[in-house]
């Protein structure tokens, strides 16, 4: 039986590729997709979800737009990474269908209520929508199998010295998620920076030769440009968000540890930092499965294998 999932995302190049991977995988049943604000404005990320589903010929999947700003802060976007549209690079189709009239939280709640089995929530943007769901529907917590997030880091941040972008955008929301009592799986920068795509990988995807693999290659052509900055020390570009889907499909290519994680919401230098109690110093029981390593070749091979689904 396919694993039922809800994807909450803010496309974004790597979010878009996470959608491509999920919808090429019969092991997963994508029951709903909601959009969050982060990589671009809420209007643009919602439009990008619809554009990707139009490209992938999946207008059957319910879509809803989420919160327009973080719980307690003004919105920060990463247009310097993802471009003016949020998905600069390839020529994507205009949406062929409209989102649901309700909110992301309403669609998530409806999906959870109607599911015969607990649902995994995959969240690849700021945690605002998921936190709002948890706060407004405590009766549905038992319907959530786990929350798999791309966010945080044990070591270095990528938006501030201490904080990864998704968590920094809405640290209060992330703290709600981590302390919810629901199992959390964290794909942080410690692992996603190892899940790099190189120029040869992009050409491998392009050579698959179907329309979707070509679009993915063109998305990566653009995404690579930002990551060529010498300050990062990257050879390729880290594909952050697809790590969440890849973990669901092939957990054996990841190394994980069980640890307690908290989110700093007030620090002068550390707002948005995920504090991972690696050495069990706090006495707190682990609340998260934290990814710490990945077989990077296995990750690339999985993407290449699933791109052939679209032939």
Curated annotation (Swiss-Prot):
Keyword Acyltransferase: no
PROSITE patterns, per the entry: IUNH
Alphabetical UniProt keywords: Glycosidase, Hydrolase
Record-annotated membrane-spanning stretches: none
GO BP terms in the entry: nucleobase-containing small molecule interconversion; purine nucleoside catabolic process; pyrimidine nucleobase metabolic process
E.C. code: 3.2.-.-
Record-level Gene Ontology MF annotations: purine nucleosidase activity; uridine nucleosidase activity
Class of the enzyme per the UniProt entry, highest EC level: hydrolase
Cross-referenced InterPro entries: I/U_nuclsd_hydro_CS (IPR015910), Inosine/uridine_hydrolase_dom (IPR001910), IUNH (IPR023186), Pyrim_hydro_RihA (IPR022975), Ribo_hydro-like (IPR036452)
Domain of life: Bacteria
CDD domains cross-referenced by the UniProt entry: nuc_hydro_IU_UC_XIUA (cd02651)
GO CC, one annotated term: cytosol
Active site: 240
Job description of the protein: Hydrolyzes cytidine or uridine to ribose and cytosine or uracil, respectively.
Matches recorded under NCBIfam families: PRK10443.1 (NF007761)
Family (UniProt): Belongs to the IUNH family. RihA subfamily.
Full protein name: Pyrimidine-specific ribonucleoside hydrolase RihA
